[in-house]
Amino acid sequence: MNVIEINSENYKDYLHLDIIAFSFAGEGAQGEGGGLWMVTSDGKLYHTNFAYTISWEQAILLCPTLQTCDCDLFRTTPPEGWQSYYMGGGNFLIVKDTYTEIFSQLDPYDLYGQWKDILIEKIK
């Protein structure tokens, strides 16, 4: 699977992505702190890190829905039109409502290492 890496030098090239799902690690989470993984409607996978690679402000420009999620350690409340899945260890998956059926039969704790592959396979 090809991953397009976004950094502070190239993030402006990706400001208009049609993001259908993204995951991030909340404060104190296990895994990649600040990691932001995004899948677009054309099945492309993007990655950045708002703790080390880009600023929080740049991350919000890339993925505006991220700013509207109300998060704490164990839950997040996404904006209308999106669904949240807690994947354990402080990791969250946020999916557009039109794509949630793909994950409806899966245990959210099983999504952590698999959601990107599952989603991309279904939309390609």
Identify the role of each PLM range.
Residues 20-24, 28, 37, 58:
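Residue-level detector of intrinsically disordered, flexible termini
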Residues 16, 40-41, 82, 100-101:
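Generic alpha-helical hydrophobic packing signal
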Residues 1-13, 34, 49-77, 103-124:
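Short glycine/serine- and acidic-residue-enriched loop/turn motifs that recur at repeat junctions
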Residues 31-44, 89-98, 117:
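Short beta-strand motif characteristic of blades in beta-propeller domains
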